[in-house]
Amino acid sequence: MKFQSILSTATSTLAVGAAFLAVPAFAQSTGAVDFEEGAIVVTGQTQNGVAGVKLPNTSKAKQVLTQEIIQTQVPGQTINDVINLMPGVSFQNNDAFGSGGGTLTIRGFDDSRISQTVDGIPLNDTGGYALYSNQQIDPEIIEQVNVNLGTTDVDSPTAAASGSTVNIRTRNPFDDFGVRFLGSAGDFGFFRMFGEIDTGVLNSSGTKAFFSASKAVNNTVYGGIGEIDKTQFNAKIYQPIGDNGDFISVAGHWNRNRNNFFGSTPLRTDPTRVVGPDSSNRFPLTKKERFYKIADCQIPAGVTGVADPASSCGSLYDFRYNPSDTGNIRINSRFTLSDKLTLNVDPSIQYTKANGGGTVDAREFGYERGVAAPISGYIGGKPYFNGVDLNGDGDTQDTVRILAPSNTETWRIGVIASLRYDINDFNRVRVAYSYDRGRHRQTGETSLLKSNGFGSDVFSDNALADADGNILQKRDRLSYAILHQVSGEYTGDFMNDRVHLNLGVRAPFFKRNLTNNCL
């Protein structure tokens, strides 16, 4: 039985990790993990206070970080910031705490050209292939992360990766019962709690599981008006089959972000201007000016019988929410069919709902130009409600600022299946099939702002309708991204293991179906 409780503080951290170990080369899918042979040696050593990582001696350019290094970083930090330790990897974090997003590049390729997976399932957005680091899995349950520099595994289910592959592997449940709690606190109101429970082995067949949860909040580092709020749950059940390494594991993940953006300032230095993110502001010139404060605001009440103009309250980027709900269920499995034949099957399902916020000046009245009678609709980038009192002042003459996010809801299913055949002790082949199907529903409903300028309904689920009950939205489309891929791989050892040869071929077949319901 294990109990562990840790309290740590965090503002900004320079972490130095050292590890001397030999680990298996965990790749993307269970089949890729099973196919790779031998040990990759990863060494970390301290040199002038900077952690060093050596390239593994393999046929592919790879770098690996394990929990020994990951656990030395800031608690709750996104794994994309942790792999910043690797040569060739560059990650620019939006804040010091890991929940505010960032930008990843590897050897010059941006995140739309980098494939990132967790336990074999792809994390790139199926629309534009972007990565969102604020939605990454908690680092405490990551066993290791390996980065293929400039290569992908042949069964990689991606239509975009031409740069590198970042493969995240979560740990398996421990054999013994255990409980762990970690707490962190720091500047900008940062506070995070993480807890996990391992059941230990539950029965004679070896079933075991773990469950974890975390909550992290902090104030936005610029502007002083927004907040970062992240909640995450993870679970994994592992069932060994026999004593030859066969198994089935089922893992689940849910992540909820309710974050505000923090905007950038104009690249102007006019001394007559005030520091801030508005177009009339300027860039900070001193360290003290970096921590500018955005003033609170109130939307004025409408006046009956007057054509009220839209308030500017809530228009700044810093008032925007960047909400997201993401989850997945993933299965990994290995089945030995004979002494030479092994089957791996990894199915998964994912869900995402997110938007980038934004507001628009809505018209309570109808659109009149070039028509016989006023009409409603989203026209010229503006919603015309044609007779709806949005601000409650008893008339329909006003222009009112409302929330107008661009929502994307995605359901994604996938499977990676591979069959490995061991020709002899020195040669093996593998054939694989990968399927990935993403359903994207993209809409642009509107909803009201609260009196302080922030959105009252971050996804606009209670969407505003015109006088005839029609939902007004700036976009309304449905698309499917469908990938079928077949691949094959050969690996062989020659000259008493002095030469290792790896050959692979992949043939992806990708199509996208789009239905646009907007006129």
Model features per residue range: what roles?
Residues 164-201, 211-225:
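Short strand-turn segments of transmembrane beta-barrel domains in outer membranes
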Residues 36-74, 103, 111, 146-147:
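N-terminal periplasmic "start-of-domain" segments of outer-membrane beta-barrel proteins
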Residues 38, 102, 162-164, 177, ...:
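Hydrophobic, lipid-facing positions within transmembrane beta-strands of outer-membrane proteins
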Residues 325-355, 386-519:
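Face-selective signature of the C-terminal outer-membrane beta-barrel domain
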Residues 183-189, 199, 215-219, 241-243, ...:
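Transmembrane beta-strands of outer-membrane beta-barrel pores
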Residues 136-180:
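A beta-strand signature from Gram-negative outer-membrane beta-barrel systems
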